Regions:
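C-terminal regulatory/interaction module of P-loop NTP-utilizing enzymes
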Residues: 1-280
């Protein structure tokens, strides 16, 4: 089982090697990188390429590790017992299976995505150490050991909001997705917009990287935001010339709200455009 890329995802040689290293070592692949660099999409594309069902667990600040294993619905069982329900006799009716339970008991190998693990509290990764390492956990309510029939291919993504514990890191294979350079970005754009005119691509790419390289920018635009912007430019049939307008009444290129998400960054970009015009 080897990942060799897909036509829908521009994967570097290093990234493909990392995916295959995680498969060989039978360890989770921990993927870090800026938001919008394709971390989540990587899991989706690998699962598709290897013909594996994909289970996804999207982490929030309130998510607890136990939810990934199972939850016992004691309230419903108490209510049903008061109503004299027959199903109350079987405790399995009140076990809500989490994504790890589903992955471990699947009839075939699956891919498992634990998305944005750094959003949870600091103890969250530690609480999953044993389960991800040994691929098993115990359900005390039903008194059964849930052990993986087939070891899932685990992807874990992080935006670096919090540092992850060393003990957790030791159990993963790590890959950092670097922000694409202009050449790689052009390949990514070509996958999504194969018929895009070179003039519009060149003008949009120049504007995009000018914005990203602005000193003092609070939030740099991501790959996904560039793709959103291009989609809007095409939908509105905006020509390449409009992105490099010399009209002093036009402060910034059209639809730049797809790239810049606060007023300070818009103001910074307006100053850059003004300086560039004065230097022509």
């Amino acid at each position: 089982m080897k990942f060799q890329g897909t036509s829908n995802y521009v994967a570097t040689q290093d990234l493909m090697l990392s995916v295959n290293a995680a498969i060989t070592l039978k360890r989770p692949l921990l993927v870090k990188g800026e938001p919008g660099t394709g971390k989540t999409m990587l899991a989706e594309e690998v699962a598709t390429a290897l013909k594996l069902p994909l289970l996804q667990w999207h982490i929030k600040s309130t998510t607890k590790a136990q939810q990934g294993l199972y939850e016992y619905d004691a309230v419903s069982r108490l209510r049903d017992s008061q109503l004299g329900e027959e199903k109350v006799k079987d405790i399995h009716n009140y076990i809500v299976k989490g994504v790890l339970w589903q992955a471990f008991t699947a009839d075939q190998p699956v891919a498992l995505l634990i998305d944005e693990i750094d959003k949870a509290d600091i103890e969250f990764p530690n609480d999953l150490l044993r389960e991800l390492d040994r691929m098993e956990f115990y359900c005390y309510e039903t008194r059964e050991l849930i052990k993986a029939r087939h070891r899932p291919l685990v992807f874990i993504t992080s935006n670096n909001e919090k540092e992850l514990p060393d003990a957790f890191l030791r159990r993963c294979f790590f890959h950092y997705i670097k922000f694409p350079d202009a050449e790689t970005m052009a390949k990514i754009v070509a996958v999504h917009f194969p018929g895009l005119k070179q003039e519009l691509l060149g003008a949009a790419m120049k504007t995009f990287f000018d914005v990203r390289n602005l000193p003092g920018l609070k939030k740099k635009p991501s790959t996904s935001e560039l793709l959103d912007w291009l989609k809007l430019l095409l939908a509105e049939d905006i020509p390449a010339e409009a992105l490099q307008s010399k009209d002093e009444k036009v402060a910034v290129p059209p639809l730049v709200g797809a790239l810049l998400k606060n007023e300070q960054d818009v103001s910074l970009f307006e100053k850059l455009v003004f300086m560039q015009r004065n230097n022509r």
